[in-house]
Amino acid sequence: FPSGTQGNTSAILAYCRPGQKVMVDEMQHIYLSEKVVFDPSIGQLEPVTYKLDQDNLPDLDDMRRILESQEIALLCIENTHNFSGGTCVPLERMKAIHELAKEFGVPVHMDGARMFNAVVALGVEAREMCKYVDSVMFCISKGLGAPIGSLVCCSEAFSMKIRDKRKLLGGAMRQAGVIAAPGMYALTHNIERLAEDNANAAYAAEQLKDLKNTKVYGKV
């Protein structure tokens, strides 16, 4: 995909029909910034927001309340969480979310634009994190350092539905090898270096937090 927004949008549209309800947290990038799937002229989906707890993690009790009271087509999570200062959702919470969604027969999509930052920070393997979601989008053009591109990982059968939505959104690209090559290099060589990326973010937050007219949101 040329962008993470298009990757998320294609996946969500592949799960849902117009008018269906999608669970997102109240500060999620898909909900506050991307918005495509909730646009009345495009996605036509209805957002249902769940709360974050005091640690900026998905509130399981609020999730259960919504799932018990409404018909939900898809549950979306974000890891790391952009607007919460890059909060990492630990595997224990992801497992609990997955089990809760499975109880109600609801698939889980993860906006993992900076997933590998979370993987490095938590000291886990990407495969461990991804086993608790049905699909995940991640960017290779952020901390990983590639010039452009995002990927969606899911089952082979579901990927065909996503490709159809990508085509409708104008995302099919020709001669894409020139951007695939640096992405492959990034995934092979740059994941461990995200520890530097995380440290730089924490350092920047520490230096900025006491400046006048500057606010650092959450624990970076």
Where are these regions (language model features)?
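Conserved PLP-enzyme active-site core in the AAT-like
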Residues: 2-220
